[in-house]
Amino acid sequence: MSGVYALMDTLLPFEWLHYTFMKNALIAIVLLTPLFGMLGTMAVDNKMAFFSDALGHSALTGIAIGVVLGWQSQMSAMLLFGLIWAVLITFVKHHSKMSADTIISVFSSTSIALGLVVLSRGGAFAKYSSVLVGDVLSVAQGDLLALLLALVGTIACWVFLFNPLLITSVNAPLAQSRGVRSRMTEYAFTMLVAVAVMVSILWVGVMLINSLLILPAAASRNVARSAAGYMRTSVIIALCCGVIGLALSYYLNTSAGAAIVLCCAAVYFVTLPMRRK
């Protein structure tokens, strides 16, 4: 990593990047934000705006289960439970007459309550409360490899999922008539979102994860004129807001995650008048 740090010092001679923890945070943001930029487009198109919120809340339950089972890795517990929760939400949505937002709300409330009950036993919740707000400045060198693998894996899966997801979101009956397995595609997409959410939740936080997924895509939808442009613009907005928000958090001495989300929100409101009627 010393070579990467030296290159950053040469190419980005900014005061806020003099510190190693800020360099790690910047690398993490460059790896994380494209994930949310890509996945957010389909989440918005398929009216799954609160799906990541439910998965974020389930992170608490994942940690709780890991504590009960004596697991050392919080990430493993969160990933396992997040994937199970994503599959369950999708399964119930397809086998229930209730609306999707109602089902997601039920799962979201259940997961956060269950996690709080388990983690608060004996007053131990304070030990894990940092997951609520996250801290991208706490990213260590060892975490960057996991983020890189998540990005590469997501892009690889996205190559195969993008067209089926796109046609399904536009016209599900047409997709099925063309041999697209819409339900399996949706399961794969929700599991992909679960991985992205769980990998980043410790640094983004439960309270902000949904905003980071939805706001760049929503802003992009205001200005994009094609499916490819929609995704590309969403990734660019997420990446730029991530870097700008991190820099602002340094100079304003505030939360990096919140600053990033506010930048995304500002872009959304600026682009809102550009949206076609």
Describe the predicted segments one by one.
Residues A156-F189:
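Membrane-helix/interface signature in polytopic inner-membrane proteins
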